[in-house]
Regions:
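Hydrophobic faces of stable alpha-helices that mediate helix-helix packing
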Residues: 35, 80, 84, 134, ...
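Short amphipathic alpha-helical patches
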Residues: 61-66, 110-114, 118, 124, ...
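Functionally critical mobile loop/hinge segments
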Residues: 172-279
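Alpha-helix capping and helix-loop boundary segments enriched in small/acidic/polar residues
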Residues: 74, 78, 103-106, 128, ...
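Glycine-rich anion/phosphate-binding loop at the beta-strand->alpha-helix junction
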Residues: 85-197
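Generic N-terminal targeting/processing segments that precede catalytic cores or assembly contacts
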Residues: 1-99, 118-123, 229-231, 238-279
Length: 279
């Protein structure tokens, strides 16, 4: 990322300029399709009810969560619950074999989509602006993929939820008119505070703890953006994005096999649910 920032400085580009000056012209149309798919996945998830497939017997929550948000008087809490309901909606669609966008993976598909949905339908941000935000988020996701991993089986959940939170924080920072260094700072914060997160899905399903982690992840992305926006005016960040990505890779290599998508340890072994065999 440091090299990309240097190119941007040299050419007086922002991250959007960098992406579209280095990618095929069809990328914009592709990202437009991605945005549409994200928005539709939230819509479907908010309208669906019933039990998620598999042995866990988990009820869908997104619809009721969204309806509950409408009765919350505290604006701050209403915002949080509403945004989390969007993340639940997409993650529950994924758990039900619905069409979602891997951003960057299925296990973390609800974070960026939830934020895009909120900004489009609740905040009235234009499609063009959101497509540009996807380009920025995707840039950070690709750096993670190239220099480390986005696979829970390789790096634990820090590589999935952590990367998705990072991409969303970067997109959010762009949408809030933060500069290049502030965007990098937001992405770094988002990844740094997911370091060491294990991947231990109960029963092997992308349900527990995955769905709830998407809801928490989108809130963390907003927090990372906000912290960057104001802390960057107080002090210079000591840890840069490249450093935290290298650290994530190292941490993932040190995580035991039991905590990297195998369901052989962690919550997958501790949570007892009827129909799930821990042997």
């Amino acid at each position: 990322m440091s090299e990309i920032i240097e190119v941007c400085k040299k050419n007086q580009w922002n991250f959007v300029d960098y992406v579209f000056n280095n990618e095929d012209k069809e990328l914009y149309n592709y990202l437009s399709k991605i945005l549409s798919a994200m928005l539709e996945s939230v819509k479907r998830g908010l309208s669906a009810s019933g039990v998620l497939p598999g042995k866990l017997g988990i009820e869908r929550c997104a619809k009721n969560m969204y309806l509950k948000s409408k009765s919350i008087e505290d604006d701050h809490e209403e915002f949080k619950v509403r945004l989390m309901s969007y993340a639940y909606a997409v993650s529950e669609e994924n758990a039900s074999n619905g069409e979602v966008v891997t951003a960057p993976t299925l296990g973390a598909c609800g974070i960026l989509a939830a934020y895009m949905y909120m900004m489009y339908y609740d905040e009235g941000v234009s499609r063009r602006k959101l497509i540009n935000a996807l380009a920025v988020g995707g840039l950070f996701g690709n750096v993670i993929k190239h220099n480390a991993t986005i696979s829970g089986a390789v790096g634990g959940c820090q590589a999935e939820i952590g990367a998705a939170c990072c991409m969303t924080a970067a997109a959010a920072a762009y949408l809030n008119d933060l500069n290049i260094k502030q965007i990098e700072y937001a992405a770094e914060i988002a990844m740094e505070h997911h370091l060491g997160l294990t991947c231990d899905p109960v029963g092997g399903y992308v349900i527990i703890p995955c769905i709830e982690r998407n809801a928490v992840g989108v809130l963390r992305a907003v927090d990372a953006m906000t912290l960057s926006k104001y802390m960057s005016k107080i002090k210079e960040n000591v840890v840069n994005f490249d450093t935290v990505v290298r650290t994530m890779k190292y941490t993932g290599q040190k995580l035991p096999l039991e905590l990297k998508e195998t369901s052989l340890g962690g919550l997958a072994q501790e949570v007892s649910i009827k129909g799930v065999d821990h042997d």
